Amino acid sequence: MVSILTGFENINKIINCCITREMTENGLLEDVETFVNTYYNEGQVEEPIIWITQHPTTASRQADISQTMELTTPFEFDCGVYDVDLEDANMQSQNLANRVILSVLKNWQTAQAELLPGQRMIKNITLDRYSPMGYVTVTGKSDKVPVTGVILNVNHIVNWTLCCRQLNNNED
């Protein structure tokens, strides 16, 4: 368990690491050309593309500021692949979404151990939703790119007592 003072940003780092770690030669996502990990992107994108969005964190059970609190942070991955044949492109975008899930499952424990040595923040990761969402249009092209969306819930624990101790130590 970690404190809320360092916890939330580390969850984002861990999930991003799971993806970038597999975007290497012989990685599960070696074919991915663009990984967008911000809410808004003005730059040029090439497909295959993975666009990640972190949704609001909520209490997993009734909010109680006691010693520990279980929280859930959903991460949405929108995966798109272009192909002249829309049916093939749709299958390829679903395959990319499957590989994103595998990348997170394969790497989250190692990434967490490297970023937070000796600490365990993430309890588990669960699948919330898997949906072939439809298509997006690409500026300058008349073609559409099929997109498959995946939402993974990162379930984590915050230790409020540890937060208070860290705050008190910083005041000394």
Segment roles from a protein language model:
Residues M1-Y40, H55-D172:
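Charged, amphipathic alpha-helical segments and their flanking helix caps
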Residues P48-I52:
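A short glycine-rich, His/Asp/Glu-containing loop-to-beta-strand
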